[in-house]
Amino acid sequence: MNRLAQKTSNKTITMKHFADNGKLKLLIIVGTRPEIIRLAAVINKCRTYFDTLLAHTGQNYDYNLNGVFFKDLKLADPDIYMEAVGDDLGATMGNIIDKSYKVMVETKPDAVLVLGDTNSCLSVIGAKRLHIPIFHMEAGNRCKDECLPEETNRRIVDIISDVNMAYSEHARRYLADTGLPKERTYVTGSPMAEVLHQNLADIEASDIHQRLGLEKGKYILLSAHREENIDTEKNFSSLFTAINKMAEKYDMPILYSCHPRSRKRLEQSGFQLDRRVIQHEPLGFHDYNCLQMNAFAVVSDSGTLPEESSIFTSVGHP
């Protein structure tokens, strides 16, 4: 398939040409691994019914953070790479809006689909100005913590979306309280159950325990990467002091799948982790979920892991 390179400032947007097949054109925009994971089943189903383009903002593009998930979840590579990461947060957010706007002008989608509350979702600002219908999955989530960057993104995207798809009745009520029309709000549930069930055989077949020398049920799985925990000194110190105490109390390995930013912060701080806390590079979808299914406990500040862990109970894993 021919490829087109379109210059935008000093960055490049790379996209595929699509033939006109008579189908409505849907543009799906992602930028982080939680979006890729949650949307995996949706993306594949959308390709059946729509002329679907998948755009990646580049917000978190690294093989271990993103690329491996396309492989594990049997997803085709993104059709569009925006390379929107800037020198700082402001530049990145500006690039996401600017580059996604240019993509929409070029590809002329009939609708745009985003999920969640990451900075990638801010791409819908351009869609609104271009009068392109916006569909927002995972709408209506609220934590009532105004210090959380995602809380601001949620409010922006919910308000300007044409159709909001909430995971729960609780989230729908938040949308209703905001004054959003009920006829454009739907409770769809989360797509995570389908994603996990579709990949269950591969998850169970993973040999990650053998590779890492871990015994099932006798380790703790740790994920800690959120900005408010890693970049705030007080929270950072409290968190990892608690992790060390946990390692001492339970006397078992704590496997820490460590985000590059978290690893850098630990190195800079000089904080000494307990010898039982094992840092490891980010793992793929099948390996990580196999570890999650068989852990003594999962400790996380992630939004995805608690949801995955709760779903595992439906397939016989407490």
Question: Language-model segments: what does each one mean?
Answer:
Residues 21-22, 103-110, 214-215, 294:
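Glycine-rich phosphate-binding loop signature in dinucleotide/nucleotide-binding domains
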Residues 59, 67, 204-294:
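Donor-nucleotide binding loops and adjacent catalytic segments primarily
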Residues 114-115, 121-124, 136-137, 164, ...:
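A donor-sugar binding/catalytic signature common to diverse glycosyltransferases
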Residues 4, 10-59:
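N-terminal subdomain of nucleotide-sugar transferases
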Residues 10-13, 59-64, 83, 160-235:
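A nucleotide-sugar donor-handling region in carbohydrate enzymes
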Residues 25-30, 35-42, 49, 69, ...:
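Active-site and donor-binding regions of nucleotide-sugar-utilizing enzymes
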Residues 28, 54-56, 114, 136, ...:
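Structural beta-sheet core signal
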Residues 60-76:
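N-terminal beta-loop-helix "entrance" segment that forms/cooperates
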